[in-house]
């Protein structure tokens, strides 16, 4: 685990974004942890989050031309990542997002910001079922662009109904990488090192053993 990943997990816990206990997921599974990126809900939190996204993206080495934030949650994430890339990595790159509903006046259309062209890097919080990414792929392909990869905050490393995780299915179906700031493996490592949080380690390990990839 790299230093920025450890810092990200600590930050997520401090903000209440990453919590431990007993949570019922949409899938019906009872999880010993819960991740809600919507709680990065202040200016300072979003700025720090953007720096973590930028660090993961630069570290991945993925080549891309434009950042894309899927409506709605991906919009501030793509913006924050673009700002962090410019301010902390000297990379001034274009970014854009889509509207859920196309406008019929003004600039019109369903896309806002830079042109969606070339190699597109998708920025989102998590990939749960992969449905949202499949919708985004239609938008990208409709513009004659191609997806370079996906950048998310946390990889749960959890299989869906089959043997693969939603992330693995996206990587397989679209032949592109999915990069995360941190993964469940990193969370487990963090728990093992933290005296106060170590009590949650066995429950998360058991969940990983049952549903992990």
Curated annotation (Swiss-Prot):
Pfam families: Pribosyltran. Its cofactor is Mg(2+). The keyword Acetylation does not apply. GO terms for cellular component: cytoplasm. Homodimer. HAMAP family: PyrE. Catalyzes the transfer of a ribosyl phosphate group from 5-phosphoribose 1-diphosphate to orotate, leading to the formation of orotidine monophosphate (OMP). This is Orotate phosphoribosyltransferase. It comes from Azotobacter vinelandii (strain DJ / ATCC BAA-1303).
């Amino acid at each position: 685990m790299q230093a920025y990943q450890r810092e990200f997990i600590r930050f997520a816990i401090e903000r209440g974004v990453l919590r431990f206990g007993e949570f019922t997921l949409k899938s019906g599974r009872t999880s010993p942890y819960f991740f809600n990126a919507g709680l990065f809900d202040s200016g300072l939190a979003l700025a720090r989050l953007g720096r973590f996204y930028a660090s993961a993206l630069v570290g991945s080495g993925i080549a891309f031309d434009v950042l894309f934030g899927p409506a709605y949650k991906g919009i501030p994430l793509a913006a924050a990542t673009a700002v962090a890339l410019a301010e902390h990595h000297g990379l001034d790159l274009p970014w854009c997002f889509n509207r859920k509903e196309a406008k019929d006046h003004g600039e019109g259309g369903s896309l806002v910001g830079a042109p969606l062209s070339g190699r597109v890097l998708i920025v989102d919080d998590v990939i749960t079922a992969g449905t949202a990414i499949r919708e985004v792929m239609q938008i990208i392909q409709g513009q004659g662009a191609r997806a370079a990869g996906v950048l998310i905050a946390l990889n749960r490393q959890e299989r869906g109904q089959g043997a693969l995780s939603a992330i693995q299915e996206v990587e397989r179906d679209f032949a592109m990488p999915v990069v995360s700031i941190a993964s469940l493996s990193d969370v487990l490592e963090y728990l093992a090192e933290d005296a106060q949080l170590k009590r949650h380690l066995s429950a998360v390990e058991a969940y990983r053993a049952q549903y992990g990839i």
